[in-house]
Amino acid sequence: MLDSPHNPGSENAAPHDVVIVGGGLAGGLIALALHRHAPDCRFMLIEAGRTLGGHHRWSWFETDIRPAARGLMAGFDLNGWDEGYDITFPSLGRTLPTAYRSLASAEFHAKLIAELPAERVMLETKAASLDAGGVTLADGTRLAAKRVIDCRPFKPSKALSGGWQVFLGQQFRCETPHGLTRPVIMD
């Protein structure tokens, strides 16, 4: 998504192969994949907030990530239930066998900060504009790049249509054991 006109002069001095704007789940995982699988790639991850991943809990079915791509999640402190999950409705419930995973943003941030080179992550740095040749930061600094990936939060656009699911993940610490062995998914 272009925020400003392309600056053709920036291509000649592109110190970055890729600049990723937005350090949420998508941006953080892209940076991690580049670090692990393209070690010569000169990338920069820019996040406006103090932490990567914000304040979220991401949960997914094991089958949501194809087997060949699951290695990207290696090393994250995941909650996981291999025996499946329970679903409940007002008058019925059942157990489904698909493994379920969950990751808190604090663990996401900790893992990325521990693994990504410090010089490749900019926290508390706001991007003022993006174009095909790089990113201009709020302080006026220009980061020239061969490629820019916009991973900032979704903004409504007439050019896009679709829907999404709203997810509320809650984690409770109980004074006494609750006896649950699987997560409960409620629709």
Predicted regions, residues:
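N-terminal Rossmann-like FAD-binding beta1-loop-alpha1 element of flavoenzymes
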Residues: 9-45
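Glycine-rich nucleotide phosphate-binding loop and flanking beta-alpha elements
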Residues: 27, 52, 155-157
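N-terminal FAD cofactor-binding segment of flavoenzymes
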Residues: 33-37, 43-91
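Predominantly flavin-linked oxidoreductase catalytic cores and closely associated redox partners
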Residues: 37, 119-187
